Amino acid sequence: MSSNHLGISGRIAALFQQAQITPLLALVALLLGLFAVGVTPREEEPQINVTMANVLVPFPGASVRDVEQMVAIPAEQVLSKIAGIEHVYSVSRPGLAIMTVQFKVGVPRIDALVRLHDTIRENTDWLPAGLGTLEPLIKPKGIDDVPILALTLHSKGADHTAYDLERVAVSMESDLKRVNGTRDVVTLGGPRRSVRVELDPARMNANGVTVADLRRALQSANMGMPVGEAISANRAVWVEAGPFLESAQDVADLVVQVSNGKPVFMRDVARVQLGPLPATRYVWHGTAHSEGGQEHDAVTISVTKKAGENAIDVARSVLQRVDELKGSVIPDDVEVVVTRNYGETANDKAKKLIQKLLFATASVVALVFFTLGRREAAIVGSAVILTLTVTLFASWAWGFTLNRVSLFALIFSIGILVDDAIVVVENIHRHQQLHPGLPLFQIIPGAVDEVGGPTILATLTVIAALLPMAFVSGLMGPYMSPIPINASMGMVLSLAIAFVVTPWLSRLWMKPHDATHAEPSNAPAASTGLSDRLRPWFEKVFAPLLSERDGPRNRRYMGLGIAGLIGLSVLLPATGLVLLKMLPFDNKSEFQVVVDMPVGTPLEETAATLHDLGAYLATVPEVSHYQAYAGTAAPINFNGLVRQYYLRSASEMGDIQVNLQDKAHRKAQSHAIATRLRPALQEIGQRHNANVKVVEVPPGPPVMAPIVAEIYGPDVETRNQITQAVREVFERTPGVVDIDDTRIASAPRKVYRVDRHKASLLGVSQADIVATLHAALSGESASFLHDASKYPTPTQLQLPAALHGNEDALLQLSARSTTGKLVPIREVVQVQNVLREQPVFRKDLLPMDMVMADMAGAIDSPLYGMFSMRAEIQKIRTPDGLPVQEYFIRPPGDAWKQVALKWDGEWQITYETFRDMGAAYAVGLVLIYLLVVAQFGSYVTPLIIMAPIPLTLIGVMPGHALLSAPFTATSMIGMIALAGIICLLYTSDAADDTPCVDL
């Protein structure tokens, strides 16, 4: 064929089939791919730019109502005007307001935080001076705050306490921070080092000393600064005054008062010692019975990485540095256990997916080998390898990391990527059969041109089907965006390689045929034999449909039958034979046991509950080891980031990080293990009056809880009543587990009410009384040692731990009057015993409560649990006798006039994802239709070509049912891709020039 009659594809093939630059381009593509594999950061999860921040406003002494009305509500109104805000949450507790600002997915972190800081600084008048609030504290959080590595230090014997281990961990922090790519290195656990000044009320009164005197002595004595220069002997001498307090002995030797002409030292009225603070948290490491079954005091070092860094490299470098520190910074009898290594799990996941990618490629090459021959298979295999490598480079250039989603995109599209090369090679092979006497360089341009137009159209149709998915909103959007983007880029690059490199390889590797010694090809014979065997079956099936007499009736019956099958397929999810859920569970190596004791539970009782839970976990064969955290939170994962587990620091809170054996050493999946252990763990929790929840790492974007019911109402009493009724429905519903709500259990509260009139008559200020009581019970860091510690060592004024429950000792403390006399606090306060106030939760400027739960059992999709409760919830009546209004998509417009329930959790993200993917599906179908119309010049023919698309339901839904697989977002992606796999092949024939459409 003359080059003047060739289309764009034929001309490209003619240009590059003998060009010397073609092998260079192929080599560059290969090297770019190898470069991308080496430099692309490897992570287990894709990077999601989701920014949230906590704004904490302390309001000491304020009631919940004051905190809500005077701080939280004005703050919400200020924060909600920031551009890019998704939600504003707040919780008002006694003395503290916590506002959580959640930005929309995709808003750049720096931009979001700059807007937040600017807005707060520009609106400081919402916290007027003198109100009593402290400076707002902004704590931003994002995906990079999730530690990739956790190192737990424990003693091999019983020689080291948590205090000793904390000192070792703090010494390690600076060395680990020197590793390139690390972001934060933080020690969790340990009591912290301090100079404890334990007050002795009797000796203080005997010596005429108050807490204010001790505070003043510490602060005034710990003062030093440069005071200037002095000229002496014709030289300038730098002059300083001081010195600072440098040791516990310096503190003990301070003179705090002069009594009867004699100095009163700090050691005379308090016990001064350097050591750990009173325990406010416990951390310990436990091993399974198979590994000894022991528990040891521990601390954990968590390491986060900078954005864009390779998790594998950072984790490997940190562990190498730890090995270097052993024997020097780390004592020989201290063991370091790697309790989290997301670098290793990311590497394992990447290796596994790359193996699957290679297997898929080998399968395609093997298929071509058996149908076309070994030379053709080698050409297709080379084209596929080049396509994959250059696609990896394009993915890196786009900004994607190498994670399970981006690699899944390549595996998912491997069958599509090979189509272009196979079509070109097969048509060149066919033209060799038709023109055995012509040299390959003359055959190739025409053969490529013949299928070039349909191949371009086929590529565009697949891109049209997939690319709209890149615009899915919410958390799932950036989570799944590598799939449509990588697959679309791969399709374009596959087309370029098919037109540029494949003709060049075909000219070199395919054996030329001549007219007299042409080797017969096995493929046509096999194809002909297969056609001969299938022809009677096709005639038997399709003849009744094409019959002139009975054909119309049979076609109507067939249409009704197909419609019925489609209808039955659609009904499968409704009947529960095919479960609908966001994503299938992954086989993880960890899960958490989250424990909530009744509010007011002492730390020691929480620890006792965790010990009992740990003793049971040690007997589980699949458990390798665990770490228990009482009064503090374990290193968070992405799930904990969204659920704000990092704020769990009360004495009644705890959790256990459970680490399972490697997947290769256990048969059960992590989800099955967690489901199996939940009943026993919750039974142990019930014995301790604890709410125990088993929290798994979600396979996709996390939510506050899988099932969330948000309760809106006009007043607190109504919301509490409806919340309790909804919780009871949750508890009665089979399969609904891990039930909790935002209310707290009734707990005692003691109020020391100052008699202002009497205090004024005695010359004592209320501020002195409150400050004295606060220092005695909570402790007060009156000053700090200057001892070159990384973390400043506070001098902590406080009653001894043994006297914390002794009200007489507390009220024995005195305050100094304006006349200098000591006034015992018991003379100016009245003790009231009341209950703790309930916190108030708000979302997007509306007060609300939440009931949260998970779903477990045979039907573990939260959607089915949610819908199964609707009938019972509709029976609930408000105090006015009205039903509770249900909302599924948006919150109620006016929560002050009605009681409403808004379903959230996994339902919300599932709805948004499938809504957007359904819209993407529709847009893809429209684009495919327009492309095919442009190709055929007909508005009817494309409808005939696209008619089989709905038939995919007949295969997809029953297939999921047969395999007991849930229909997930990835299933939806597969359905969308099926709509785009329309390969248009033009086959030139002497008698017929009609296009052949292969669906």
Describe the role of every protein-language-model region.
Residues 2-361, 402, 478, 698, ...:
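Membrane-proximal extracytoplasmic
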Residues 3-42, 451, 521-581:
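Signature of alpha-helical transmembrane segments and their immediate interfacial
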Residues 5, 14, 68-140, 202-223, ...:
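Solvent-exposed, membrane-proximal periplasmic/extracellular interface segments of envelope transport
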Residues 35-39, 362-429, 471, 489, ...:
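Hydrophobic transmembrane alpha-helices and their membrane-interface caps
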Residues 134, 413-428, 452-471, 478-525, ...:
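Transmembrane alpha-helices and their membrane-interface boundaries in multi-pass membrane transporters
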Residues 339, 346, 350, 425, ...:
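Helix-loop junctions and hydrophobic alpha-helical segments within the transmembrane domains
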Residues 342, 378, 680-988:
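C-terminal transmembrane helical bundles of large multi-pass transporters
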Residues 653, 986-993:
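Conserved small/polar residues in nucleotide/adenosyl-binding loops
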